């Protein structure tokens, strides 16, 4: 409203005696003028005071280099010869927004009635129509409404000609009312003119149409005046938001506009309790007591509780538990975003900040708290302007301004340490991350607040679990923040579970929505009879839903009485939230999962034939980790699989990822042949600063950060550059790795598998003694001999500090012919499955299977020749037949070998030779 009136008024005509004026233009008035000048809309004009039909005074208001009052006075002095009459000084500058709205509405009423003037009756209608001010409330309480008042006004003065001039003047009585309203404001000791003062001026004038309207409506002017003065007295605290210089009681209007009083919030009990942090609060108090440079700066990682220390200081001040140097002071947190917001013109930001500093200096009881203090640097800076930090520097050094800053270590280094002048004005106070025990105490201190918010209870075990599990599994955040978030989200989860509607109520609710849609459709079609029937049905269903909800509440209340206090957040709920955040199963092992873990070897052997030692080692490691017995500071396990090519080293890692972690994609696979050169090693942790790819992160570190619970396969480890092994030392020992950006990546929940072909030559030489033709004891002793030889060769290739950190070095056996036959069955099944998608049923004979095994068996190369044999003998033959259209969708195909050893592919209708056992026929 202020903006519209600012255009409609020719303000300088309302001002006189600029030498005597004590009132400077308010921010709101100036902003209104600027806005309206920019808009250039054709608003209402108001005349009646001398000199209103002159040049565009809004342009005068916009001239740079002058404050609001100077601009107004300049405009008045240029026309002093014509402005003979003495007019109330700076009147409209002191109108509140509600009073401005009243005048605007009065003009609208004049236009509505077709009158070329604004009289006392229009001001009365404006007072009633404004609706929210003291005047409107008093008139409403007297039974006066806008409709009746309009009728009375029209009875008394009738309607006008209909032609309304562009400029609507005030009648002499209306001008007298405005002058009397200013007088009433002065008598009440107010530095502003509100709607209540306009009403008092109207009553005091006592004559005119408005007085007759009030009389006709049965209102007693004396009674109205009494009510207005009473309400003004009651709301004395709430009228401080004024236009102009504001209420004399408010010494720090700028600070209140752009800051929040933490001490007041502490007195009202709105701040969370601060547990611990005594040394930091005492150090802050100590620094605040200094004569100069008394500005502590809290530095710590995000989430360790820097802001909580400022709140703790505010609580101590509120409780009087502080030394006399800061006793009775107010801690006010400054919103830098709000301070900068809206400063469109040069110098506005600096003006706000200087006002704020002046208020702090004059009050002498303000401690300013700036969260994210690094935002001072560059705030408000434009071409040729200076930023907030440079404006504040002199005051910070001389001790005129007590300021507590808070920022993170990175931001402090990046912004504040770069400016030594600013750095020396702040005294750093390090805020370390609390320990797990301290975090538990903090959670117990906050427990009551979260119980009230979520309407439930937390067990001690839940709080302890939140601290411990967040510390162990959430590595990229800091205590107590991550533990508090766990507690909060667990409370939200439990509350939502208990707040759900009963199933019957949900069904009824769906039906109600359907009925409402149908009812609206009938109403649109004006079929009100049907709509009425549906409305009755809707009401019945809603009553049923209410009854079901009430019944549920009664049942939960009964449960509450038996179980003390309703829903309870337990350790299980905290574990569930940790699992949902990280993907790491930390909840207790269920019966089904226990069975799965105990039978893990059998399941893996369905895919991995032979290699009992490796399968058992993997299974033991997973079981150990799942029940929580593994070392919490090391990876789940780290293995090196050594052996000849094609015996299942990589396949075992894939099988584990598919079985236990959900899919083969859950595995992070790094082919170490890609890291053969020295400069490629940096790809694991990310390029160093200044190199291409620095922002992308490392292939290994980024993958583990996104999926902390997984299998990491380093395939063909011996192909990597030796520098890779140096990098892996800290992963194997401490379960951590620092990437190129300095972030620590947690490997404590990963299973590390390295495959290697080192020692395959030794195995090949001794391989003839390891076979199915030997008895068990001979096989075992031969395996142990080969294992020791391979281990010796590994020691020659890898450095001892690398091998010493591995949990186990597992040597894979060469595959026997029987094992190759089992692998052939698995590979043939894969072909059957691929053909099944094309609706072709395939069977192979025993002779064909033996032929495949004979051609595919090679102890030195493992199972890979078998894959090539199947490709050549089966897949190639099938492909030719399918292209020749001899095999079509829906056919049943049998593959056999004739007496000459040639592969023959027969359609099922051509005759059935000896078929494969059922296991291999799909």
Swiss-Prot record:
A GO-annotated cellular component: chloroplast
Record keyword Cell membrane present: no
Region (I), start-end ranges: 255-502
Signal peptide: none
Primary location group: plastid
Keywords: ATP-binding, Chaperone, Chloroplast, Nucleotide-binding, Plastid, Repeat, Transit peptide
GO terms of molecular function: ATP binding; ATP hydrolysis activity
Keyword Repeat attributed: yes
Region listing for II, in residue ranges: 569-760
Binding annotation for ATP: 300-307, 643-650
Organelle transit peptide residues: 1-72
Location of this chain's protein in the cell: Plastid, Chloroplast
Region feature Repeat 1, mapped onto this chain: 95-160
Domain UVR, residue spans: 509-544
Stretch list, region Repeat 2: 170-234
Family per similarity comment: Belongs to the ClpA/ClpB family. ClpC subfamily.
Protein name, as recorded: Chaperone protein ClpC, chloroplastic
Organism: Pisum sativum
């Amino acid at each position: 409203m202020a903006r519209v009136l600012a255009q409609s008024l020719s303000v300088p005509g309302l001002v006189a005696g600029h030498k005597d004026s004590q009132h400077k233009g308010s921010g709101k008035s100036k902003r209104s003028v600027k806005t309206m000048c920019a808009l250039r809309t054709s608003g209402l004009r108001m005349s009646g005071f001398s000199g209103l039909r002159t040049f565009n005074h809004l342009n005068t208001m916009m001239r740079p280099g002058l404050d609001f009052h100077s601009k107004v006075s300049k405009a008045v002095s240029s026309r002093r010869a014509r402005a003979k009459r003495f007019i109330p000084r700076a009147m409209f500058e002191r109108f509140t927004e509600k009073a401005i709205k009243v005048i605007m509405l009065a003009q609208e009423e004049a236009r509505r009635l077709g009158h070329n003037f604004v009289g006392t009756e229009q001001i009365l209608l404006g007072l009633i129509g404004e609706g929210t001010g003291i005047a409107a409330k008093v008139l409403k309480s007297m039974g006066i409404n806008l409709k009746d008042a309009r009728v009375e006004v029209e009875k008394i003065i009738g309607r006008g000609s209909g032609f309304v001039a562009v400029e609507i003047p005030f009648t002499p009585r209306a001008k007298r009312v405005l002058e009397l309203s200013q007088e009433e404001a002065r008598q009440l000791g107010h530095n502003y003119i509100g709607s209540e003062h306009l009403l008092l001026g109207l009553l005091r004038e006592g004559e005119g149409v408005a007085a007759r309207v009030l009389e006709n409506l049965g209102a007693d002017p004396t009674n109205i005046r009494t009510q207005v003065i009473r309400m003004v007295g009651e709301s004395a605290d709430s009228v401080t938001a004024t236009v102009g210089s504001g209420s004399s009681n408010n010494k720090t209007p700028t600070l209140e506009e752009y800051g929040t009083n933490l001490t007041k919030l502490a007195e009202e009990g709105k701040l969370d309790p601060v547990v611990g942090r005594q040394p930091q609060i005492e150090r802050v108090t100590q620094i605040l007591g200094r004569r100069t440079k008394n500005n502590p700066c809290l530095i710590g990682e995000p989430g360790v509780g820097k802001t909580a220390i400022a709140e703790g200081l505010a609580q101590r001040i509120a409780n009087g538990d502080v030394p006399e140097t800061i006793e009775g002071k107010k801690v006010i947190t400054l919103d830098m975003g709000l301070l900068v917001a809206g400063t469109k013109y040069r110098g506005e930001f600096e003006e706000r900040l200087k006002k704020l500093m002046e208020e702090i200096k004059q009050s002498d009881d303000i401690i300013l708290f700036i969260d994210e203090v690094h935002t001072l640097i560059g705030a408000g800076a434009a071409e040729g302007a200076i930023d907030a930090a440079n404006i504040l520097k002199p005051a910070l050094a001389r001790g005129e301004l007590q300021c507590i800053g808070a920022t993170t270590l990175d931001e402090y280094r990046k912004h504040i340490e770069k400016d030594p002048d600013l750095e020396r004005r702040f005294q750093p106070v390090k805020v370390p991350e609390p320990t797990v025990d301290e975090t538990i105490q903090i959670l117990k201190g906050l427990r009551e607040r979260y119980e009230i918010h979520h309407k439930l209870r937390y067990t001690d075990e839940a709080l302890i679990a939140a601290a411990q599990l967040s510390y162990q599994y959430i590595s990229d955040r800091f205590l107590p923040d991550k533990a508090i978030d766990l507690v909060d989200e667990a409370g939200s989860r439990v509350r939502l579970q208990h707040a759900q509607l009963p199933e019957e109520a949900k069904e009824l609710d769906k039906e109600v929505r359907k009925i409402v849609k149908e009812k609206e459709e009938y109403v649109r079609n004006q079929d009100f009879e049907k709509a009425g029937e549906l409305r009755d049905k809707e009401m019945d269903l809603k009553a049923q839903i209410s009854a079901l909800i009430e019944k549920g509440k009664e049942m939960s209340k009964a449960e509450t009485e038996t179980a003390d206090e309703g829903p309870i957040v337990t350790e299980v709920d905290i574990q569930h939230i940790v699992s949902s955040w990280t993907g790491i199963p930390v909840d207790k092992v269920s019966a089904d999962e226990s069975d799965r873990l105990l039978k893990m070897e059998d399941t893996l052997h369905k895919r991995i034939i032979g290699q009992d030692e490796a399968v058992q080692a993997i299974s033991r490691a997973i079981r150990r980790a799942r029940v929580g017995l593994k070392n919490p500071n090391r990876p789940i396990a780290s293995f090196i699989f050594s052996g000849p090519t094609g015996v299942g080293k990589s396949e075992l890692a894939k099988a584990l990822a598919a079985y236990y972690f959900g899919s083969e994609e859950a595995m992070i696979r790094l082919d170490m042949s890609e890291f053969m050169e020295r400069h490629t090693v940096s790809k694991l942790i990310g390029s160093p600063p200044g190199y291409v790819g620095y922002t992308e992160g490392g292939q290994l570190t980024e993958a583990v950060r996104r999926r902390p619970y997984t299998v990491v396969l380093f395939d063909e480890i011996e192909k990597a550059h030796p520098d890779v092994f140096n990098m892996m030392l800290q992963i194997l020992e401490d379960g951590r790795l620092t990437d190129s950006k300095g972030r620590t990546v947690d490997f404590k929940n990963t299973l590390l598998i390295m495959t290697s072909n080192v020692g395959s030559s030794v195995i090949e030489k001794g391989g003839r003694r390891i076979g199915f033709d030997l008895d068990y004891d001979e096989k075992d002793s031969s395996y142990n001999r080969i294992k020791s030889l391979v281990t010796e060769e590994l020691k020659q290739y890898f450095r001892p500090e690398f091998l010493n950190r591995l949990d186990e070095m597992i040597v894979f056996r060469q595959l026997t012919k029987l094992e190759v036959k089992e692998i052939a069955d698995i590979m043939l099944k894969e072909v059957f499955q691929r053909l099944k998608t094309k609706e072709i049923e395939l069977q192979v004979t025993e002779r064909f299977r033996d032929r495949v095994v004979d051609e595919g068996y090679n102890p030195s190369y493992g199972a890979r020749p078998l894959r090539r044999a199947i490709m050549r003998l089966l897949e190639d033959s099938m492909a030719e037949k399918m292209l020749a259209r001899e095999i079509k969708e829906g056919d049943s195909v049998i593959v056999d070998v004739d007496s000459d050893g040639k592969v023959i592919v027969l359609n099922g209708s051509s005759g059935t030779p000896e078929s494969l056992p059922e296991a291999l026929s799909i």
